[in-house]
Swiss-Prot record:
It comes from the Bacteria. Cell division factor that enhances FtsZ-ring assembly. Directly interacts with FtsZ and promotes bundling of FtsZ protofilaments, with a reduction in FtsZ GTPase activity. This is Cell division protein ZapD. Belongs to the ZapD family. GO terms for cellular component: cell division site; cytoplasm. PANTHER family: CELL DIVISION PROTEIN ZAPD. SUPFAM superfamilies: YacF-like. Keywords: Cell cycle, Cell division, Cytoplasm, Septation. GO terms for biological process: division septum assembly; FtsZ-dependent cytokinesis.
C-alpha cells in the first residue's frame, strides 16, 4: 500500500516537513561523494530555516508535557504494558530535558559562523556554489568523506532535540489512529467528522490502482478525491470505485 498523509493544522504540517528534511539529511550525510554532502549541507540550511520559528520549540515542549501528563497516570495499570509505557515516558522526559538546554535562537550558530553563512547565501543562487565562487568550500569538499561527515554532523548537533521531539509527536499521533476500509464511489469519498478534532489523516491505496488521493477537510467533514496521471499531463479525476484505507489520527 502507498501511504499519503495530510495534516489538519499548521503545527503537524511543519512537523511533517521537518521529518522529510531530517530523513533527506540523514540519507545524503551517509553517502561518500562531496556532491551528496553538498545536498546534506543545504538541507541543514533548510532545517534551520524551518526550526528558526520562534514558537516551534515552545510548542513542542508544551505538547510533550501534555503527553507526559496524559500517560503518567497509567503507571501501575495492569491493563497497560508497563515496559512500553516507561520507554515512551523516558523518551519524552529526556527530550524535554534536551529541549530545555537549548540556548538562544535555533540555528543561530550557523548565522554566527561567517564561512557557513557565506555558503548559505550563495546556495540560494542557481549555480552559486561553483568553485570560483567559493574556493574555500571547494577545498573543503576535497577533504576525506569522514571528515566532511563529522563537520556536518557537528553543525546539525544543536538542532537534534527538535528532530527527536518532532519524531515523538508524529509517532504518538500516528499510533492514535484506527484504520478503516472504505470505498470512494466513482472516485469520491466524504465523511462527517461530528465535530471531533483530528491532527492527521492517512490514506493508503493499492499501488496497482495508480491513483492519487487529493484531500481536504474542515471541522465538520472531510473529502477525498482520486485522480490519475498519464505521462506528464495534469492529473484527471477518476470515475471508478476506489477501495482504500483511511486513518484519522488525534493526539
Amino acid at each position: 500500500m502507498i501511504l499519503y498523509e495530510y495534516p489538519f493544522n499548521e503545527r503537524i504540517r511543519t512537523l511533517l516537513r521537518l521529518e522529510d528534511l531530517f530523513e533527506r539529511f540523514a540519507f545524503f550525510l551517509a553517502q561518500e561523494d562531496p556532491r551528496e554532502h553538498h545536498v546534506a549541507l543545504t538541507t541543514l540550511f533548510e532545517i534551520a530555516e524551518v526550526t528558526g520559528r520562534a514558537d516551534l520549540k515552545s510548542d513542542l515542549m508544551k505538547e510533550l508535557e501534555r503527553q507526559r501528563q496524559t500517560l503518567a497516570p497509567f503507571r501501575g495499570n495492569p491493563g497497560i504494558e508497563q515496559n512500553a509505557l516507561e520507554a515512551v515516558l523516558g523518551e519524552i522526559e529526556q527530550t524535554l530535558a534536551n529541549l530545555a538546554q537549548m540556548q538562544g535562537k535555533t540555528g543561530q550558530h550557523l548565522v554566527d559562523n561567517e564561512w557557513l553563512a557565506s555558503i548559505r547565501s550563495r546556495a540560494v543562487i542557481p549555480g552559486g556554489t561553483c568553485k570560483f565562487d567559493l574556493p574555500s568550500y571547494y577545498a573543503w569538499q576535497q577533504w576525506p568523506a569522514e571528515q566532511r561527515r563529522q563537520d556536518i554532523a557537528k553543525w546539525m548537533l544543536p538542532m537534534l532535540p527538535l528532530r527527536d521531539a518532532a519524531a515523538i509527536v508524529l509517532r504518538l499521533a500516528r499510533e492514535s489512529g484506527q484504520a478503516s476500509k472504505v470505498m470512494a464511489m466513482q472516485g469520491s469519498y466524504q465523511q462527517m467528522l461530528s465535530g471531533r478534532s483530528y491532527q492527521l489523516m492517512q490514506v493508503r491505496v493499492p499501488p496497482e490502482l495508480r491513483v492519487i488521493p487529493e484531500a481536504s477537510a474542515n471541522k465538520y467533514m472531510l473529502w477525498v478525491r482520486f485522480t490519475m496521471q498519464d505521462g506528464d499531463v495534469r492529473p484527471r479525476a477518476v470515475d471508478i470505485d476506489v477501495p482504500f484505507h483511511l486513518t484519522l489520527c488525534n493526539l
